[in-house]
Amino acid sequence: DLKKKTYVFEGPIDSMFIPNSIATAGGDLISAISDFPKENLVIVYDNEPRSIDTRKKIDKAIMNGYNVCIWPSNMMSKDVNDMILSGLSSDFIKYVIDTHTYRDLKAKFELNNWSKA
């Protein structure tokens, strides 16, 4: 339901745990969702602050006006699937995503901090 907040993941397994989610199965996320309204989309990349590729993808999403999840520094798992395997509930993970979703300048600021973690 695109009238509700929709979570966009790279991988289909991650999208299975969060309600109202879609996955692009790799490739360029921004190109895959360019026809969807941005207001209700949250792009959720893997938790890889050391990955130059991931940081570039998040920066591209921010520059294109999307909401992005910037994982908090105390989340050690690489992705939602790993978080579930480590014992976290899908409700808790959704809460973390919702409370760490940013856009525009705040997203840039959080991305810079996350990259230093």
Label each residue range with its predicted role:
Residues K3-T6, P12-A117:
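TOPRIM fold recognition
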